[in-house]
Amino acid sequence: MQVIVLAGGFGSRLAPWTSHIPKPLLPMLDKTLVERVLDLLPIEEVDKVIIAAGYRVNDIKHYFNNLDLPFEVIVQPEEEPLGTGGAIANCKEFISETFLVINGDLITSVDIGSLIKEHKKSGVLASISLFEVEDPTRFGVVKLTEDNKIIQFQEKPKLEDAFSNLINAGTYVLEPEIFEIMPDGAHSMERDVFTKIAPKGEMLGFEFEGYFVDAGTPPSWLETCRTCFVDNRWSTGTNQKNNWVGINCEIVNTSMTDSFISNNCEINESIISESCILSNSIIKSGSNLKNTLVGENAKIGRNCDLENVIVDYYSIMPDGWKQSGGRYPNQ
C-alpha cells in the first residue's frame, strides 16, 4: 500500500522551534514527530510512503536519506501551500492503488489495519477515521447513517448547532478515482471533495476509541509527549517517577512532575512540571518551569520563573527572569 503523510505546514504555532527545524523533525521523546506517525502504519502492508512537505524540504529529504526503513520514502515538495486536497493531488504520480492519507502531526490509537479492511469491504471511494469529542467546535463534524456511511459534513460548528460529536480524525483510505473529483490547484479535501461524495453514499466512517492528539500547539505538544510516554511509545531513556528522562542527563535535587527531558540535559535544584526540555539544555538552581517548552542547547539562569513559555534553541536566559506566556526571547 502507498501512504501519503501530510506534512506541508510551517509549524508557526511551535515557533521559534520551527525556525530551526521543520515540525516533522522535531524530537518527540526519542524519535522525531514524523517517525511517531510512521510507527502507526501497518508495516507489513506498506511499500511506499510519500511525505507531502512544504517547508525546509531538503532537511526532510536529508533526514530520510539516512534512515533505514522497511519501505521506500519519497519527499514530494509543495512549491506553494496547496491545502489538504492540493497536497494529496500533488502526490498523484506516485499512486497506483488504494492508498492511505494521514496527517503528519497526528498521534492516534486508530487501528489503521482495520480501517483499511473495512474500507475495502465497503467498496466506497473514501473512508475516514472518526473520534468522539466533548467539544466539536474546533473540528469538522460528520453525520452517520446506521450502516456507518457519512452523509453530511459540518465544519467547526457552534456547540448548539453541532449535529454530532464525531469528528474527522485525520486518517483516510482513498481510491485513486478520487483524483478525478479534485479541483485543480489549492483546495481542501474536507470542504471541496468530501462534501461532494458524501451525499452519494461514497464515504464510510470508521469510529475508534482511545486517543487522538494533534501536536500543533505548545499545549498539544505536551499532550502528545504525554500520550507517547504513557502508551510506551519509546525505547530509550527511562521512566523516573512518571517523567521521561533521556540518556546522559544529570538531574540534581529537582522536583519533576509529568515532564519530558531529552538527552544530555543538566537540571539543578529546580521545579519542573508539565514541561518538555530538549537535548543539551541547562536549567540552573532555583528555577521553576511549568507548561514550558525549552529548545535544544538553551541555558536557563538561576531563579527563573517560567509558565506557558516556549524558549528558543540556543537561548541564554539571565538569572531571575520571570515570564508568563509567549516566547523567549520575545519576537
Regions found by a protein language model. Give the residues of each.
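Glycine-rich hexapeptide-repeat left-handed beta-helix
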Residues: 93, 265-331
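Catalytic-core segments of class I nucleotidyltransferases/pyrophosphorylases
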Residues: 99-100, 107, 113-120, 134-136, ...
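C-terminal accessory/binding modules appended to enzymatic or scaffolding proteins
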Residues: 245, 250-269, 273-278
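Short internal beta-strands
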Residues: 50-54, 129-130, 293
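Conserved beta-loop-beta/alpha segment of the NTase-like Rossmann-fold superfamily
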Residues: 60-146, 183
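N-terminal glycine-rich phosphate-binding loop and ensuing alpha1 helix
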Residues: 1-61
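Long, charged amphipathic helices and adjacent flexible linkers at domain junctions
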Residues: 229-250
